[in-house]
Regions:
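Positively charged n-region of N-terminal signal peptides that target proteins for export
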Residues: 1-4
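Bacterial N-terminal signal peptides
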Residues: 6-15
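Aromatic-Pro/Gly-enriched surface loop or interdomain linker
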Residues: 21-80, 238-239
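Extracellular ligand-binding/catalytic regions of CAZymes and related secreted enzymes
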Residues: 22-27, 53-54, 63, 75, ...
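An acidic, glycine-rich "communication" segment
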Residues: 25, 44, 113-191, 241-242
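Short alpha-beta junction capping motif
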Residues: 30-35, 76-123, 204
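Solvent-exposed loop/turn segments at secondary-structure junctions
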Residues: 35-38, 65-68, 88-92, 110, ...
Length: 242
């Protein structure tokens, strides 16, 4: 009997070794698209295809209208590993607001894009309290923003493979970030320089935010790679390809 058990154990070991280590379950990403101004539904729809084709992720998408009332299905964030938020001036219902605030209070991971700094009209403090930002409007249309890696940020894992590029969208005013924010990228346009991507912790949870995110930004391979890596970084998981 012992001989049989030993043979079975050996067979299992050899089988596992031959097949390699078991793959981790897919990272569950909840994409919240509610910014018509920057066509977040289109950008995140294409980004979802990119993620699911190239990384070990499984996505859920919920959508709302720009400056609208509520985001149907936003409760799905409870079941995800990380929320990617791209919304603009949404007035959440009372129950939806409680859901989002509970998510944040629990210190769950967030990746915020562009208008996420003013995502919720009935929770304006979300920007400072959670994202660590200080959105004060933007400089308006004009010259393209020269996006570069910030000093002392070149070795950050989110930026692996990132190359400077020019963003065609208005530069957000965000000087005066939270004290624990680590600036990863800066943008310069018309002689003005602002932080355009940073990380921080909120209630122990990892936060990444970028004020970039116009439709053409999502076409940049480096920008897409940065966002994908931010999702894994926020959940403290190594980047896992398909």
């Amino acid at each position: 009997m012992r001989h049989v058990l030993a043979l079975a154990a050996t067979a299992l070991f050899l089988s596992a070794a031959a097949g390699g280590e078991a793959k981790a379950p897919p990272l569950k990403v909840c994409l919240v698209a509610a910014c018509e101004e920057y066509h977040s539904d289109v950008s995140l729809g294409e980004f979802r295809k990119h993620l699911e084709s190239n990384y070990n992720v499984a996505c859920t998408t919920v959508s709302g209208k720009d400056a609208g009332k509520g985001i149907p299905g936003i409760e799905a964030i409870r079941d995800g590993d990380v929320m990617l938020l791209f919304a603009r001036r949404i007035t959440l219902t009372d129950e939806q607001l409680k859901c989002v605030q509970a998510y944040c209070k629990a210190g769950k991971p967030i990746v915020g894009v562009r208008t996420a700094s003013h995502a919720f009209q009935n929770w304006l403090a979300f920007d400072k309290e959670v994202l660590g930002g200080n959105y004060q409007g933007h400089y308006g249309d004009g010259p393209k923003a020269d996006v570069r890696i910030a000093d002392r940020a070149k070795d950050h894992p989110i930026l692996a493979g990132f190359k400077p590029f020019a963003s065609a969208y208005s530069l957000y005013k965000n000087t005066g970030l939270a004290g624990d924010a680590q600036v990863l990228l800066t943008g310069t346009a018309g002689g003005k320089t602002e932080p355009v991507a940073w990380t921080r912790l909120h209630n122990g949870g990892r936060i990444f935010y970028t004020s970039l995110g116009g439709p053409d930004d999502f076409k940049d391979a480096g920008f897409r790679r940065m966002l994908a890596r931010a999702l894994f970084w926020a959940t403290s998981r190594p980047v896992e390809g398909r």
